[in-house]
Design a protein with these regions (language model features):
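S-adenosylmethionine
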Residues: 87, 91, 95-187
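Conserved S-adenosyl-L-methionine
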Residues: 69-73
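Residue-level recognition of conserved structural "scaffold" positions that shape functional pockets
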Residues: 59, 78-80, 175
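Class I SAM-dependent transferase core
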Residues: 1-68, 98-115
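Conserved SAM-binding loop of SAM-dependent methyltransferases across substrates and taxa
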Residues: 74-87
Length: 187
């Protein structure tokens, strides 16, 4: 992790050290199980950590906000977000057992008390959340249909409870017909 990322995101020394440790754990685990594309692993800081932290430019979550990381894979964006938002509860889920086993191990080694992990399909959840975050897991319409009834009724943050989806490329067709959404340019 470079100094410019530390400055860009206003990381504390502890947050910086946790992100470095996270990166090391991902690199170690990635030798055994494909969490991050082998072609992309050398760009982990920019393409994965910085991308995950970019939410902090736009959202300042209040204490006890509940966030579901749908299809967390290698713990992205949930683990980096849990590091910079220690007052927020993150629930990281994935349908792939070996991935969620790794993510649970990483969260334990990082001592992230605000992270819960589960090997579960979103349709089997019986909890409610303020936000659902997801990084390139599925189309908006598929995520919407799976999660539309998962939100808490009371809004406690500046933004209305809902989805925070990390998308790339031209998303105009994907969001055609969606009444209300916001887009943010990252880097």
């Amino acid at each position: 992790m470079s100094l410019d990322l530390v400055q860009k995101f206003g990381l504390t020394k502890q947050q910086y050290n946790l992100l470095i440790h996270f990166e090391e754990l991902i690199f170690d685990w990635n030798k055994k199980i494909n969490l991050i594309s082998r072609k992309d692993i050398n760009n982990f800081k920019t393409n994965h950590i910085a991308h995950s932290l970019s939410t902090s430019f736009y959202f300042k979550f209040k204490s006890d906000t509940k966030v579901l990381d749908l299809g967390t894979g290698g713990g992205l964006p949930g683990i980096p977000m849990a590091i910079i938002f220690p007052h927020v509860d993150f629930h990281l889920i994935d349908k792939v057992r070996k991935k969620i086993t790794v993510v649970a191990d990483i969260a334990k080694k990082l001592k992230l008390k605000n992270v819960k992990t589960d090997w579960i399909n979103v349709n089997d959840l019986n909890r409610r959340y303020d936000f659902v975050i997801s990084r390139s897991v599925a189309s908006y319409h598929k995520i919407f249909n799976q999660c539309k009834n998962i939100f808490l009724s009371e809004n406690k943050n500046e933004f209305e409870n809902g989805f925070i989806l990390y998308k790339g490329g031209d998303i105009s067709d994907e969001f055609k017909g969606v009444a209300k959404y916001h887009t943010y340019e990252l880097f």
